[in-house]
Structure formats: C-alpha cells, structure tokens
C-alpha cells in the first residue's frame, strides 16, 4: 500500500505541475516555453497512471483522494494560502475513500 501511495503522489505532482505551467503562461503572462515542460510533465503523468496495479476506473477513483491532498499541499506551499478547516476535513474524507477503494484491490 505504501508503494501505491507513493506512486499516487508522484502521479499527482506530475499532473499538477503539468497543469500549473500552462496556467502560468495563460494567467500570469509566463513564457510560452512553459508549455514544453508542461507537456513533458503530463506525459509523465499518463505513464505513471498506467503503472498502477488495478483496473483503470478503480485506479482513477482511488487516485482522486491522493490528488486532493496533493492539491491542498500545493495550495499551501506554492500559492501561499492557509488551509481552512474544511480543507482538512475534505482531505480526510478523500483519503478515507481512497483507502476503502484501494483495500479492495486484488
């Protein structure tokens, strides 16, 4: 389960970075060259997602819980926003759902 969770975290970070860089380009007038590492990051995201040990729909559902937590860490660490109590509660619920789904993998 630890290996799967670490793989989910790497997958989420690749997705977040791959989406954040075009956001910088579009919203913050960043360089169009940001699209090159964004494409590489999203390619890595897709490849990492293919490494997960269960049917794709189940993987996507469980991955969503880890993605929520990683996005909140990004919100705090990169965007500089303080997490609210509702963020913490939502993260706990998302991880609980991820754990329930992943516990049924064979």
UniProtKB/Swiss-Prot annotation:
- Which Cys pairs does UniProt list as disulfide-bonded? none
Spell out the subcellular localization from the entry: Cell inner membrane
- SUPFAM superfamilies referenced in this protein's UniProt entry, alphabetically: Multidrug resistance efflux transporter EmrE
Provide the alphabetized UniProt keywords: Cell inner membrane, Cell membrane, Membrane, Transmembrane, Transmembrane helix
Q: Where are the transmembrane segments?
A: 6-26, 31-51, 59-79, 85-105
Cellular component annotations (GO), alphabetically ordered? plasma membrane
Instruction: Name the membrane topology term.
Output: Multi-pass membrane protein
Source domain of life is Bacteria
Q: Which family, according to the similarity comment?
A: Belongs to the UPF0060 family.
- What is the protein name for this chain? UPF0060 membrane protein Csal_2746
The source organism is Chromohalobacter salexigens (strain ATCC BAA-138 / DSM 3043 / CIP 106854 / NCIMB 13768 / 1H11)
């Amino acid at each position: 389960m630890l290996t799967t969770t670490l793989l989910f975290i790497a997958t989420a970070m690749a997705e977040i970075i791959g989406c954040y860089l075009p956001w910088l380009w579009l919203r913050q007038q960043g360089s169009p060259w940001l699209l090159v590492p964004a494409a590489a990051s999203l390619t890595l995201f897709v490849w990492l997602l293919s490494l997960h040990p269960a049917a794709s729909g189940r993987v996507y559902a469980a991955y969503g819980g880890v993605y929520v937590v990683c996005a909140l860490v990004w919100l705090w660490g990169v965007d500089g926003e303080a997490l609210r109590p509702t963020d913490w509660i939502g993260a706990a619920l998302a991880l609980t759902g991820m754990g329930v789904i992943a516990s049924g993998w064979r």
